[in-house]
Regions:
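Bacterial N-terminal signal peptides that target proteins for export
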Residues: 6-17
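N-terminal signal peptide c-region/cleavage motif recognized by signal peptidases
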Residues: 26-28
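Early exported N-terminus immediately downstream of N-terminal targeting peptides
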Residues: 33-114
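Surface-exposed, charged secondary-structure patches
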Residues: 112-155, 205-216
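Short beta-strand edge/turn micro-motifs at domain boundaries
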Residues: 154-182
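Low-complexity, intrinsically disordered terminal/linker segments enriched in charged
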Residues: 172-216
């Protein structure tokens, strides 16, 4: 038996549906546009890998680290970070091909370093510090702070984010006071000097190394 709704009732249903869809898309947009939610969501995904996939660390470490890379890779603006690591002097000295090559080299080495470091933290928790005001989520550059709790110690993490056409992307990370961007830039400059500012040789010998950032 079919029910026949009168016009006012249909209009009410349409209005409620419209409001629901507006709220849904507003929440989706807020999640995409809010850098704190962006960082926190991905951090919790990493925590799940660290805890739920702990056994995989012993049986297949490469796969374990790849799961971390899959989360972390889309979060970073590698082109901007790589250019910053090269510094203005060496970026201008490098050819377009060498610049593009370093983006790939730096990306692989950074992901390997980050995944290997995270893998050693094991059963940890990460807490994001949300601001009282949401006003700065509409800015182009934002700093998001977190606290890593390894069980025995707590360490501060600070993400520097910049909004581009793809959304929010990480452009620098400071872990326990160690500025990774600055550390890598100093390494690049030292390596370039060692190789008489030969960019090709510098790229061939590049290895991202930030130690354990004071976390153990």
């Amino acid at each position: 038996m079919f029910k026949c709704y009168n016009r006012p009732m249909l209009q009410l249903h349409k209005k409620n549906l419209f409001l629901f869809l507006m709220l849904f898309f507003a929440l989706e947009s807020f999640t995409e546009e809010n850098p704190y939610v962006f960082i926190d969501n991905n951090a919790q995904k990493m925590v799940q890998v660290l805890t739920l996939e702990a056994a995989l660390f012993e049986t297949d470490r490469s796969l374990y680290e790849q799961k971390i890379k899959d989360i972390f890779e889309p979060m970073i603006d590698f082109r901007r970070v790589a250019a910053s690591v090269m510094g203005k002097k060496y970026y201008l000295l490098a050819s377009q091909g060498e610049r593009s090559e370093f983006v790939l080299i730096f990306k692989d080495s950074l992901l390997d370093t980050y995944a290997e470091t995270l893998a050693q933290w094991g059963d940890s928790t990460i807490t994001t510090k949300f601001p009282d005001s949401k006003s700065n989520i509409y800015e182009k550059n934002v700093e998001v702070k977190q606290v890593l709790n390894t069980g025995s110690s707590k360490y501060p993490i600070s993400y520097k984010l910049r909004r581009n056409e793809e959304g929010w992307k990480i452009v620098n990370i400071i872990i326990n006071g160690v500025n990774l961007g600055l550390t890598f830039r100093n390494q690049f400059q030292a390596l370039a000097v060692t190789h008489d500012e030969n960019i090709d040789l510098t790229l061939q010998n590049w290895v991202s190394d930030a130690g354990d950032a004071g976390i153990s």
